[in-house]
Amino acid sequence: MSDATYIEIKSLYKVFGGQPKSILPRIEAGESKQKILDETGHTVGLKDINLTIKRSEIFVIMGLSGSGKSTLVRHFNRLIEPTQGQILVEGEDVLQLNKAHLQEFRRQKMSMVFQHFGLMPHHTVLENVAFGLKTQGVAKGERNRKASKWLADVGLDGYEQQYPAQLSGGQQQRVGLARALCTDADI
């Protein structure tokens, strides 16, 4: 597989608050996050993030609690819209995708494991894992087969008809992982 650039983030900023673009000059002038928060009520989430991820590269984003890891990753598929910057996946500007193309991008290109798992409590473990395939329009038999395979791969064979509340936190996390892997998304 080629080592060509797959994801590129250029000059990404995220400011939370009522007028985020008005804060950019203060950030660029070097004012601290705390001063900006104290004086404007705006929170600087991301400041001038630039990164390149190659195809087939394992890329780790790590940092202290509250440092912006989840905020950054949620920008990749526009679960959070940036204040400024560019997000390219295979050279395509994700910020330029219309609603229909963005929905297709999210269904086909990217899967996420959320910090709090995001499991649907009134659906079985099998239904939770198969959910992404359902949104892709995969037939029920095929999605259940794939979901069962991934449940077995994460050590939860036999738990298909259980509900999330019946599982430990670690088991719930594995359900979230199986759901993300089940769609065979590129990212």
Regions found by a protein language model. Name each.
Residues 177:
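Hydrophobic anchor residue at the start of the ABC signature
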Residues 98, 106, 126, 152, ...:
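Signature (C-motif/LSGGQ) region and adjacent switch/coupling loops
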